[in-house]
Amino acid sequence: MIRITRSYASNLGLRLLSSNSKWNKPFDFTNLNSNKSAEPFDLESLLVRGTSGEGTSKKSSAFSGPEKNAIHNNRFVNMFDKTTQTGNKHVHNNDGSEKFKEFNQKHNNKKHRNQRSHGDRRNHMDTKKSPRKALRFQISTGSDQAQNALKDLISKVHMVSKSYKVKFVNPQNNKLEQKHLVEIVNDLDLAENGLFMVAPSKEGDLPLVKTNKVFEMIKHYTTELATQREKELLEKGSIAAQKAIRQRDRAEKKKSATKILTLSWKISLSDLNNQKKMEIKRRMNKGEKFILYIGDKRSLYSARKSVDKEGGIVENMKDTTAVNEEESEEVVNVNDPSDVDFEIKRRHMIIEELQSILEECECQFDISGHIDSRIMVSCAPPIATTKPNEGNLEENSSKELKKQKKLMKLKKLEEKKQKKTKVEEDLDSLYSFKIED
């Protein structure tokens, strides 16, 4: 018994239809009335047994000659049997699929060709134009405040020069060079040095950049921030800001005003040589300009009160030989003429002692006024003398210079002692003269 499944039977029926000459076309009933005898049905030829080679040989024997051509021409069979076996491989006979493959291959070749040309164009552009080098500011040294000050300077330079090109004063040879700000900043040691910008006088010119100390750059930056903040507060109407501005203006006026050092005619010589001498030396060491004002208590009070107007006092008191009407009240007013002579001599001794102190301090001074009323001495620090040449330094050794200084000091001390003895003798003679009277 041979068992035939449903699928196998359907395949057999299709093959039977294709093998019959009467059924060249499906559902074609024109040839049914023909009297041609049908060929005997051979079931064994349709069965596939054994190996694949035997099956294929039987298939080829079953469908040979004109019957094979009939299978290919039957469009109903071709709908279900799209492949024919050639060995162990399946070959598609669909012409549409082959055309689609050819179209895809042409499209891919065109796309690849376009990509290649675009890449060649990019390579050509790269070789034609070299890429621009990105310039960046590298600020790694220094404190945060110093870095902020430097960033503020960079922004100021950018406002004037968009390309960051500046005129730079080279600190090594003090020559003016045109340089890029990035090179200057990247070579700068912000822990020690800073930068300072001078705005150009004309619009087209480049800004001038110099090196300075870091603390100077930070100070300039902080003052700018403070002034900017003050303006903002004043615009808002802050009372505290207005008060701070007034106090600052007063302090600036006091600094700009020349200092006045007051002396009374009744000062003793010991106080003059100790207290006042130390104060004069301290002011000279600071390099301050000041005025020595000698007079009575009334005039001293008016001098202290008019500190801001000492310029007018200087002009009024310079080159005054006669006593004014206002100064007549300050003249020595005593009944005994001998007391007047004694007071005048005492005042002369105070002025001589003061001159010796100023000469010892090596300061420049100018005396004006009248001894009967008041005297003003304008003092200024000594002018810096030029350093001696190297040849003179070699000739005068350090030991010889020290000896010379010591001798000069001794001479000055001896002169002072002699003056003091003379002053004391004069005072003693005056006092003895009074006692005898």
Curated annotation (Swiss-Prot):
Keyword Transit peptide assigned to the entry: answer is yes
Primary location class: mitochondrion
Superkingdom of this protein's organism: Eukaryota
The Gene Ontology CC terms held by the record are:
mitochondrion
Basic residues composition bias: residue spans:
107-116
**What InterPro entries would the database entry show?**
AIM23
Bias-annotated ranges (Basic and acidic residues): 117-129
Determine if Phosphoprotein is one of this entry's keywords: no
Q: Where is the transit peptide?
A: 1-24
Keywords assigned: Mitochondrion, Transit peptide
Region described as Disordered: 104-132
Where it sits in the cell: the answer is: Mitochondrion
The UniProt entry, under Pfam families, shows: mIF3 (PF14877)
Which family does the record claim for this protein? Belongs to the AIM23 family.
Record-given protein name: Altered inheritance of mitochondria protein 23, mitochondrial
User: Lineage of the source organism?
Assistant: Eukaryota, Fungi, Dikarya, Ascomycota, Saccharomycotina
